[in-house]
A protein has these predicted regions:
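Ala/Thr-enriched low-complexity intrinsically disordered regions
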Residues: 2-6
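Charged, alpha-helix-forming regions
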Residues: 8, 12-282
Length: 282
């Protein structure tokens, strides 16, 4: 029986999820295999792809349009904790139905490090701060059906830390969960990789709103809607020119520089804001 070749000391095998371009990695690996494995011995490089796909799949965000359109403000740490919960809710391979989603989520420091590329000490502080901010904050939903036009509720029912284990268990308010998993079948989806370089929650929320209409590339809204849903400060609420100068235009510049979208906007005669955008890959 043929002996399998050993990997030379000078060859380094990196984790697949560190490669932005898996095809480049597989091509390099194929060259190494061709030079080092004995004739007749083959290596299935395709077997390495699921790990990459799984990692990227779990870095995808899928949130209900009710959440995209909700009024809330969270600090960046809390927004990231919310992302980790949404990833668990929608990309659990064992989950068959959205109705199976429980309000309990485990938030680990190690996951925060992996997805947001920060040191463990920073992640530990961020997770604690994020969970605390969620626990102290409320969110306002605007259901299209039902008795109420606005529903304001606290995010969480409970949060508990496991000391020494680097993890938190949080329980969402059971009345909030239907809005998270979707009262309808309409969702906003995007990749965490696409907006990971945005460090302003209000800019992130603008990006999420654009992604809601990604299929058409057109979104029409108003100054009042942006101020209400993104909880913009009074100076921007009271002066549309100030809002454009200090929020909207800098936000679109960041989105154009750091995400896959290319966005422009115009102001209609009636004051509405018309956004046109497309994916840069198109």
């Amino acid at each position: 029986m043929a002996n399998f070749a050993t990997v030379p000391d000078k060859v380094q095998i990196f984790p697949v999820d560190k490669y932005r371009d898996s095809l480049q990695f597989l091509f390099s690996l194929s060259l190494w295999v061709g030079k080092n494995l004995p004739i007749g011995i083959e290596m299935d490089t395709q077997a390495l792809l699921p790990a990459t796909k799984t990692f990227k799949k779990r870095a995808s965000i899928k949130q209900s349009n009710e959440l995209t359109e909700a009024a809330y403000y969270l600090p960046l740490q809390a927004k990231r904790v919310l992302w980790l919960c949404l990833m668990q809710a929608y990309f659990n391979d064992s989950q068959e139905d959205d109705s199976d989603v429980l309000p309990l989520f485990k938030i680990s420091v190690s996951d925060y490090v992996k997805y947001f590329n920060v040191a463990t000490s920073v992640a530990s502080r961020d997770v604690k701060a994020g969970v605390n901010a969620l626990g102290e904050s409320t969110v306002t939903f605007y259901p299209k059906e039902g008795e109420f036009e606005e529903v304001k509720r606290p995010w969480l029912a409970e949060a508990g830390m496991k000391r020494g284990r680097g993890s938190w268990q949080i329980e969402f308010n059971y009345k909030v969960m239907p809005f998270l998993v979707g009262l309808t079948s309409q969702f906003t989806t995007y990749s965490l990789y696409d907006c990971g370089q945005l460090n302003s929650v209000r800019v992130i929320r603008l990006y999420e709103s654009l992604c809601q209409f990604r299929s058409t590339g057109v979104w029409i809204t108003t100054h009042d809607w942006l101020c209400e849903r993104f909880m913009l400060p009074a100076s921007q609420k009271n002066n549309i020119a100030e809002m454009k100068r200090t929020f909207l235009e800098p936000a679109l510049k960041k989105i154009n520089e750091k995400t896959p979208l290319k966005v422009t906007y115009t102001t209609e005669e009636d004051g509405r804001l018309l956004f046109n955008f497309l994916d840069k890959k198109q």
